[in-house]
Amino acid sequence: MKETIQGTGSWGPEPPGPGTTYSNPRRERLRWPLPPKPRLKSGGGFGPDPGSGTTVPTRRLPAPRPSFDASASEEEEEEEEEDEEEVAAWRLPPRWGQLGASQRSRALRPSHRKTCSQRRRRAMRAFQMLLYSKSTSLTFHWKLWGRHRGRRRNLAHPKNHLSPQEGGATPQVPSPCCRFDSPRGLPPPRLGLLGALMAEDGMRGSPPVPSGPPMEEDGLRWTPKSPLDPDSGLLSCTLPNGFGGLSGPEGERSLAPPDASILISNVCSIGDHVAQELFQSSDLGIAEEADRTGEKAGQHSPLREEHVTCVQSILDEFLQTYGSLIPLSTDEVVEKLEDIFQQEFSTPSRKSLVLQLIQSYQRMPGNAMVRGFRVSYKRHVLTMDDLGTLYGQNWLNDQVMNMYGDLVMDTVPEKVHFFNSFFYDKLRTKGYDGVKRWTKNVDIFNKELLLIPIHLEVHWSLISVDVRRRTITYFDSQRTLNRRCPKHIAKYLQAEAVKKDRLDFHQGWKGYFKMNVARQNNDSDCGAFVLQYCKHLALSQPFSFTQQDMPKLRRQIYKELCHCKLTV
C-alpha cells in the first residue's frame, strides 16, 4: 500500500462523510471512511416498491471520467491515463471515484520538473538505442513503439478490454490439466542408430535444410522467384540489419521475408552478366549431375537409410556374438555391405561414413560392451576384463595366454603340448618337486613340440622344445639374451626323463636363441607376439607377421577365443 502525506495542502478539501476526522497532518497510512449505501431504484415498471426486507440488485454506474486541463499536453494526458490505471490496480475504495476531477488530476499529476526529466530520459534512451543497439530495424521500432501502453494494445481484437457480458472476448482460462512446468515422464526410449545420428546433428546445431517451397505467414504469401527478377521483392525489401533496400517501381517498399532474424554483415552488388554466369553455371552443374547414370551415382552417393539400418543390424549381431566391438574393423563391415547390396562401399567417402556410423553406435548407451558376457572352454572362463586386454596396447594376462595355448594344443593334440604360464615360475622357485605332478597323465617325450610361456616381471617370452632334435629355443620379441631360462628347462627335461624311464632323453639337450624373428616396437605387444609364435610353430608356418600386423592379429585372437577355435 502506498503511503502519502495527509493534509489540506496536498489533497485539498476533505471529502464529505460522517465521522471523518483527521488528527494533525502527519505521515500515516490512508484511512478511508465507509462508503454510503446507494439508494435503490423503484417504480417505472421495475416491480413493486421494495420494502425494508426486500433487496433489488442494481447495477453500479461507472464513475465519471475526470476532466483534463486544456493546457495539458498530449503526453501528459497519456501519463495521467497510465497513472489512473495504476491507481485502479491498487484497488482503492469506491469513494476515490467521487472526488473532484481537478483534485485527482492535481494529486496524480507530477511536477513540471519531473515531467521534463522523464521526457529527457526517454529521449536519451531512444537515442542510445538508435546509436548502439544491434537489433534489426524491425525490432528497434517495436521497442520504441512499445514505450506507450496504449499503442501496445492488440488492434486485431478491439474488444479485449470489455467484459464478456458487454460483448468482449472470453478470457483464456488454462485447462485444469495444463501445467506450466516441464513434466517429468518416463525416460525416452533407446534410439536407433539413425535416430542417434539425427540427435547428434541437433546437438551440434546444424541448421535445417530449407525446403524451397513458398512461405506463408499472416495471410501474406511471399514466393521466392528468380534471383534476377526485379519483381520478386528481393531487391526492394528492407535488409534485416537496418539497411534500406531498393524501392519498387512506384516508390513503395516491399514486404520483407518472414525470416528477418538473419544479420547481413557485408552487402555488395554484382553486375547482371556476372550474376547470370554464376547462376547459369550452377544450373548447368545440376543438369550434368542429373545426367549421370543411376547405377554409377548410386554406387558413389552417400549412404541411404537402408544402408544405415543394415549397418546397425550388423553391429547388433556382432555385439551379441563377441560381447563388444573390440574385434570389429571397418573393412569387415564394408565387405558385408558389398555382399548384401552388390555395390561398392570401399570408396574413401563411403568408408569414412561407415566408420562414423560405427563410432556413433559405440557412443550409444549400452553398446560399449555386453555386461556378463563370458567365454568358457574346459576349465577356462574368460570375462570381459580378460578379453579387454586384447584391445589397443593393453598387456595380455595369464587367462588369455593359457586358454589360447590350450586352443593351439587341441588343434594338433598328437604333436604339441602346451605348459601353463605358471609352470616356469613354479619351477624356478620350487624346483622339479614343485612341478613333477603337472605331467603325470602326459608323456611329453611322445610329443614333437613343447611350448612353455615365460613371464618375467612385465615381459612375455617363449621357450620351444623340439623333442626329436633335443633342442631348446628361446623366442623373445625384444631380442634379449636370457640364459637362465634354457638351463632351467634343460634340468627339468633331464629329471622328467629319469622319472619316466626315458634315459635316451637324459643327455644331448642344446640351447639356442632365435634372433631373426619379428621384433616389437613398443612395450605392450610381447604377449601377442608369444601367442603368434605358438600358433605358427604348432602349425609349422613361417613367421610372416610384423609389428604393423599386431592390431589385426589382436582382433583375430579375440575372435578365436570367442569361437574356441583357431583360424587355420
UniProtKB/Swiss-Prot annotation:
One of its GO terms (cellular component) is cytoplasm. The active site is at H459, D476, C526 (nucleophile). Residues 380-537 are annotated as: Protease. Residues 72-87 have a biased composition (Acidic residues). The modification Phosphothreonine is found at T170. This is Sentrin-specific protease 3. Residues 106-119 have a biased composition (Basic residues). The lineage of its organism: Eukaryota, Metazoa, Chordata, Craniata, Vertebrata. Keywords: Cytoplasm, Hydrolase, Nucleus, Phosphoprotein, Protease, Thiol protease, Ubl conjugation pathway. Its EC number is 3.4.22.-. On oxidative stress, SENP3 degradation is blocked by inhibition of its ubiquitination, which stabilizes it as it accumulates in the nucleoplasm. Belongs to the peptidase C48 family. Residues 1-119, 155-174 are annotated as: Disordered. The gene is Senp3. SUPFAM superfamilies: Cysteine proteinases (SSF54001).
